[in-house]
Amino acid sequence: MKLKPIEVAEILQKEIANINCLSEIKEVGQVISVGDGIAKIYGLANVKSGEVVEFKSGVKGLVLNLENDSVSAVIMGDDNQVQQGDNVKRTKEVLEVPVGKALLGRVVDALGNPIDGKGDIASKEYRHIAMKAPGIIERTSVSEPVQTGIKAIDSLIPIGRGQRELIIGDRQTGKTAIAVDTIINQKQAHSLTNESDKIYCIYVAIGQKRSSVAQIVKKLEDAGAMDYTIVVSATASEAASLQFIAPYSACSMGEYFRDNGMHALIIYDDLSKHAVAYRQISLLLRRPPGREAYPGDVFYLHSRLLERAAKMSEEKGNGSLTALPIIETQAGDVSAYIPTNVISITDGQIFLESELFYKGVRPAVNVGISVSRVGSAAQIKAMKQVAGSVKLELAQFRELESFSQFGSDLDPATKAQIDHGKRLVEILKQAQYRPLPVEEQIISLYVGTKKYLNDVPLQKVKEFEDKMLTEIRLNKKDILESIKNEQRITEETEQKLKAFLENFVKAYCVMP
């Protein structure tokens, strides 16, 4: 039987229509060279900057350089698994990480994979790591406080929700200790049912020792703070690419809380090592070096990260993301490249000094050059009532103390002012991992500023404070409750407090 051409065409059309096969176009390139965590790839003509590519071994890469005839990608994992000649395929995706409450209590790597041995994370939502910072209209001014539990900070350098406050100082001056204390201090708010009081915490370890990260996680677990904390770890032994993306990944996790009307606090520990990792990547990508061999866009590296911290407007849910970046200085040099960059991006800095630390003033906050540019608007009225004069009194004390070294003859008024200053410094000292509720801080500062400590020997100020707070917790709870609920010291509360303190000072001074 002879078929006509038109019949042949119809049969072929039917057969083709019955074939249920979708052809998938894959763009595949080839690795030209690989080394130091960088792969040079030929053949991916349409790949975009910031796109994820997949190597033959399953390891992922992030495209950072687009050149005339090739592209360069940083390998996010073990570069020994990538060899010259391997095929590389486009994923047509940008880098995403899991977000949500399922991550709370977990330790994850820079890509959001769990590394704590507690099984998979059941997260339903993913977010891009390089999200755009909120615009001006979407934001509102900082108005609610973040209580760190540290007297020297909550009274003199207050931090507000949505603020970016830099913690800067030499190594071993207690920068991480302030950050960890702030996380532990949020436990009190998490014991309440009101969601608007709670602050979820994210701690990002960049280029730290594994032992240090394990120690911090252990401390947070012991304090019961891991229940509301995510730890993102990109340790010194991991690829520079993972250290580079870790803060952005963690920031996306924090933005989930911010954009859903909740409050989050993110700690970047530390951005000096982050800049070093980015410098390493940039130099290996043959980008031109600038000052201190950092690339020209190192300012943008940190500004695009820190601008994502914000207090959102009412229309956007009233959420907030507060950032505490940490910078390590060399021999107290705050005028180096990275410290000055981050100081200019943030809304203030807490400067920790080695000299004060070795003198036993801990936390070693230099009150003179530490500043909070927006936090005072968030400070509660009760704290303003007692802390208003502290900064000035401490500045006058430092000046008088430096002059008193030159001569021994001091008039009684100057001597009294120096003695008062020494007691103020003493009352601002605080043990590590012992954050105080704000109402107890207010009472301690009230005692210091109203000169109740003048008759207490200097070496016994800490003992006096501990005994006084214990007595108030046991027998004068109404004073604490009044300050906590009213958020100010009412006349009635002040009268009660004065009567209690006068009796307590008399009783303490006659103690053996």
Curated annotation (Swiss-Prot):
Record NCBIfam families: atpA, PRK13343.1
Name recorded for this polypeptide: ATP synthase subunit alpha
Molecular function as annotated in GO: ADP binding; ATP binding; proton-transporting ATP synthase activity, rotational mechanism
Gene, per the UniProt record: atpA
Keywords: ATP synthesis, ATP-binding, Cell inner membrane, Cell membrane, CF(1), Hydrogen ion transport, Ion transport, Membrane, Nucleotide-binding, Translocase, Transport
Record organism: Rickettsia akari (strain Hartford)
Record-listed E.C. numbers: 7.1.2.2
Catalytic activity: ATP + H2O + 4 H(+)(in) = ADP + phosphate + 5 H(+)(out)
GO cellular component entries: plasma membrane; proton-transporting ATP synthase complex
Pfam family, one: ATP-synt_ab_C
Lineage start: Bacteria, Pseudomonadati, Pseudomonadota, Alphaproteobacteria, Rickettsiales
